[in-house]
Amino acid sequence: MKFFIDTANINEIKEANELGILAGVTTNPSLVAKEGVDFHERIREICGVVEGPVSAEVISLEADKMIEEGKELAKIAPNVVVKVPMTKEGLKAVKAFSDLGIRTNVTLVFSAVQALLAARAGATYVSPFLGRLDDIGHNGMDLIRQVAEIFAIHDIETEIIAASVRHSVHVTEAALNGAHIATIPANVIGALVKHPLTDQGIEKFLADWEKTQEK
């Protein structure tokens, strides 16, 4: 499973990239708005840092306007992926983008059949949301597993991005259940690196080393 970072913060992206694990970036209008910067300029800046796919989301809800926006986003850099909501209009736009050779990430996927529809429309990626399903008493990981099984049965090449990741257990279970990618906030990436036994082990090694230097 590959790791994307879910942010529009350049410093967070650079820090994750330095770890050698970063395969791509996902953004959304809320994340960019939080940065208080021009949307297109920030996407261009991110594409200059990361070689992998960078998802940039359209704002419009009508297919023709989504297509217009997406074409402009795709001009920013060759690694831009146009992020489209899972709606009827979104599916129309995905089909048009597929015909144009523009890669897409269908977001706000909450059922396996939505993922299948998006894949058949030509989506490059689908993004099932884990945390938001968990919030309403559903098991988001069941969705990842269902989508992975359906795609495997029908030999579908669309990649599954586990989104709305809240903690390290989400990441582990997404990998076990067939997600190709997990897109993760910076704070969760930081948590993945840490384990209390690792810290204890380092402390013990250092303490033992200091004892040898005292002799």
Swiss-Prot record:
Gene3D superfamilies cross-referenced by the UniProt entry: Aldolase class I (3.20.20.70)
UniProtKB keywords: Cytoplasm, Pentose shunt, Schiff base, Transferase
Record-annotated active site: K83 (schiff-base intermediate with substrate)
Top-level lineage group: Bacteria
InterPro entries to which the protein is assigned, alphabetical: Aldolase_TIM (IPR013785), TAL/FSA (IPR001585), Transaldolase_3B (IPR022999), Transaldolase_3B/F6P_aldolase (IPR004731), Transaldolase_AS (IPR018225), TSA/FSA_arc/bac (IPR033919)
GO biological process, one term: carbohydrate metabolic process
Annotated catalysed reactions: D-sedoheptulose 7-phosphate + D-glyceraldehyde 3-phosphate = D-erythrose 4-phosphate + beta-D-fructose 6-phosphate
PROSITE patterns in UniProt: TRANSALDOLASE_1 (PS01054), TRANSALDOLASE_2 (PS00958)
Catalytic activity, EC: 2.2.1.2
Gene Ontology CC: one annotated term: cytoplasm
Classification via HAMAP family: Transaldolase_3b
Role this protein plays: Transaldolase is important for the balance of metabolites in the pentose-phosphate pathway.
Family that this chain belongs to: Belongs to the transaldolase family. Type 3B subfamily.
Protein name per the record: Probable transaldolase
Species, as recorded: Bacillus cytotoxicus (strain DSM 22905 / CIP 110041 / 391-98 / NVH 391-98)
Source taxonomy: Bacteria, Bacillati, Bacillota, Bacilli, Bacillales
